């Protein structure tokens, strides 16, 4: 019971972290690669509209297959998705070891990252197995060395992964 109570204590923010209750309270610390003036005063379409116009997103068939809030990429959209994954992994491969982790983990791995119990309602659990579908690649990556003591000369560990993320959320 004590462990269950301790798991519900949130992480405390750093004292330098600004207080805020909405996105309007966010503070921009720095901007890289573009000037705000390049984008101010211009209208932009949401990505789902652009994707539909280009014929690379098919929200109707995705909804037919799985319900609302799912994606189906076609043709160039599917190829673009694959290319972006390959690009991201490739540009980071010199500094990081690529890992292809399991998509399902034990409950203690979900607890080790703070996913359980806090986000239990947003997570998918297998009915007949004591396994959870990973909500993000961070869960298996941060637990690669769970219950181990690493020496300083083994650090830092730098990992990267592309994974499917299973979680109930919309927006």
Task: State what each model feature region is.
Residues 1-37, 52, 56:
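N-terminal alpha-helical targeting/anchoring segments
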Residues 30-171:
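TRNA-recognition modules of translation machinery and tRNA-sensing kinases, especially anticodon-binding
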């Amino acid at each position: 019971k004590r462990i269950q109570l301790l798991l519900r204590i949130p992480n405390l923010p750093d004292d330098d972290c600004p207080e805020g209750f909405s996105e309007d309270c966010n503070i921009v610390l720095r901007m890289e690669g573009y000037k705000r003036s390049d984008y101010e005063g211009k209208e932009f379409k949401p990505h789902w509209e652009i994707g539909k116009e280009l014929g690379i997103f098919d929200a109707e068939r995705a909804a037919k297959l799985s319900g609302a809030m799912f994606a189906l990429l076609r043709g160039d959209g599917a190829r673009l998705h694959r290319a972006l994954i390959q690009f991201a992994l490739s540009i980071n491969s010199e500094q990081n070891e690529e890992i292809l982790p399991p998509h399902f983990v034990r409950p203690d791995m979900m607890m080790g990252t703070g996913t359980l119990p806090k986000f239990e309602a947003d997570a998918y659990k297998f009915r007949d197995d004591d396994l959870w579908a990973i909500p993000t690649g961070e869960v298996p990556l941060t637990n690669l060395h769970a219950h181990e003591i690493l020496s300083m000369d083994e650090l830092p560990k730098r990992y990267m992964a592309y994974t499917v993320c299973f979680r109930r959320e919309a927006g």
